[in-house]
């Protein structure tokens, strides 16, 4: 379980997060939602130890984040950020291998190769394994980085807008894949995401931010409501039933 206790973050005199406290459920897909600048990515970076909070603390599995050894932490959580730097002469397979570094220390064994092959197959880019990253489309590169995150094979996976640059087919494929990692392997996935219909269909739990404050949280069905979404986004969003799920309509 991830426990967030009274987290605040400010840059100079401006707070981007204010006194956020919550517990993120394990073995679930947790969606961080909210408008641009609400604090979602900042919180994701704090719980992955990429960013130090101004106040407060985070614990993972009962241990304060600051007390984790870096290598042990890298075997426990994966973080895929919004900004991805692309080394020009690196192949897809070479990139995905980096996901195994915390486990192999650079010396790949059979188990590492199996994880790499599995990640390439799951993301449907095995045929691109020998292609250089700078030869790929933005969507294909995004899939390669997601494959790297999957190859790391950690209990916790943190993804900041992983659907960027993906077409509808690939975006839906990735969300289904992430859900299967939760259901079949017991992963805990925290995802920053703007498409609330993907949230409605695939997330188990939602944490919503507004102006740096945690304004709503709970099971997805408790958040996908017109009154709650209006409070989060400041706009009217129609909700229509679709089987046992809900579709949000916000184009009018």
Language model region names:
Residues 56-64, 73:
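Conserved ABC transporter NBD signature motif
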Residues 232-252:
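ABC ATPase nucleotide-binding domains
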Residues 132-136, 140:
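Conserved ABC ATPase signature
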Residues 97, 110-128, 153, 158:
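Conserved ABC ATPase "signature" region
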Residues 48:
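Helix-to-loop junction immediately C-terminal to a conserved catalytic motif
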Residues 33-35:
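The feature captures the beta-strand-to-loop junction immediately N-terminal to the Walker
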